């Protein structure tokens, strides 16, 4: 059976990239290929059935014999080398990658006659090139980057990465790959702006573990709660919701509860959880990390999928606060469960999922967000 390498920088944490790459492996298997999972880091797919309802245990893997969580952005620079080695070892006919730093390797493999595919979650050049600062794409505007890499010594760590990066990129993806894919029409327009060609839009899938509900629970059977889903990280803007939206909701109805469900498995994410706890405490808002939570804010860290579905199905409103979300798997999941959604009017989540307001309510500032949540909370 012909081999197909699926290349990803780190397989061992749940996220949108991992869902896309694991689903790609399953699709290649269905097409008659034998997928090989590749990464600079040791690969552990044991939790994929729990995360997504996807099993990758039968697939071969290829990686360096290291397992580091530190220096993660630098390890991305070695993705292309791993891809070339895996393609050579397994005599692969296809190499799929979602990492821009593998582009030089993809071009070399393509020139050897191997079919190459790149999936662009967001064009890296737009994210690191200051020419795009005014358009809001530049990573220097990103709250996650500012928080994590804005102060010494991490700002030096980030500066060195940006200096090294051009040695691994600088190639048009349409020259490097036979097929260029992206996650949304919004991202696709930016790809065309940066590289001069428009990619094929292939929306990320809903995980098999996320059943599409044909008949959602009636409004009267749902509790007065808002649910947010996504890893604990600054770009999800949970702190903004607690500061700018929740106080207004609680003034209107003290019984409203905010659930935040997401993964927290790194020191940085745990520090963000601590920040949320302190923020709520300073505002006099009761907050808890317990599964059986009766406070105004319930932080559910690394919750099992059964609990996540249970809370989604009994909540009245789903809220998404990320600005310029490239796609928004959490938004797609909420829609699959039939929860009315409130989404920031930006990015692929707004263009492709909300369809510019046809499928969800939108907002820009805190007051508009609170108004939208209260409309849905009161079934107006």
Model-found features: residue ranges?
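Glycosyltransferase donor-sugar binding loop
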Residues: 41-43, 257-285
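Conserved donor-binding/catalytic core segment of Leloir-type glycosyltransferases
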Residues: 181, 217-236, 241-247, 258-261
């Amino acid at each position: 059976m012909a081999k197909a390498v699926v290349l990803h920088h780190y397989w061992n944490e749940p996220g949108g990239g991992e869902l896309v790459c694991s689903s790609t492996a399953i699709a290649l298997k269905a097409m008659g290929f034998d997928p090989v999972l590749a990464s600079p880091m040791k690969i552990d797919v044991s939790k994929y059935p729990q995360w997504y309802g996807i099993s990758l245990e039968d697939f071969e893997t290829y990686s360096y014999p290291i397992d580091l969580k530190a220096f993660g952005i630098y390890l991305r620079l070695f993705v292309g080398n791993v891809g070339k080695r895996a393609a050579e070892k397994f005599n692969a006919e296809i190499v799929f990658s979602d990492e821009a730093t593998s582009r030089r390797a993809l071009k070399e493999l393509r020139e050897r006659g191997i079919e190459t595919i790149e999936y662009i979650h967001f064009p890296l050049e737009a994210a690191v090139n200051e020419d795009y600062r005014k358009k809001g794409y530049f990573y220097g505007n990103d709250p996650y980057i500012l928080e994590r890499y804005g102060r010494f010594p991490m700002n030096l760590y980030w500066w060195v990465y940006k200096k090294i990066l051009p040695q691994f990129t600088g190639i048009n993806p349409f020259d490097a790959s036979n097929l260029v894919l992206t996650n949304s029409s919004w991202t696709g327009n930016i790809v065309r702006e940066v590289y001069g060609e428009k990619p094929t839009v292939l929306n990320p899938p809903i995980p098999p573990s996320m059943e599409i509900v044909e008949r959602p629970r009636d409004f009267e059977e749902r509790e007065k709660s808002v649910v947010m889903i996504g890893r604990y990280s600054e770009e999800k803007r949970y702190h903004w919701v607690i500061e700018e939206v929740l106080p207004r909701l609680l003034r209107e109805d003290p019984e409203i509860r905010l659930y935040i469900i997401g993964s927290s498995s790194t020191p940085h994410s745990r520090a963000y959880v601590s920040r949320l706890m302190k923020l709520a405490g300073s505002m006099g808002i009761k907050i808890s990390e317990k599964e059986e939570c009766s406070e105004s804010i319930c932080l559910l860290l690394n919750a099992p999928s059964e609990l996540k579905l249970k809370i989604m199905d009994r909540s009245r409103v789903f809220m998404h606060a990320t600005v310029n979300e490239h796609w928004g798997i959490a938004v797609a999941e909420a829609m699959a469960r039939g929860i009315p959604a409130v989404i920031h009017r930006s990015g692929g989540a707004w263009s492709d999922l909300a369809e510019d307001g046809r499928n969800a309510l939108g907002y820009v500032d805190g007051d508009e967000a609170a108004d939208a949540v209260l409309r849905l909370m009161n079934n107006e």
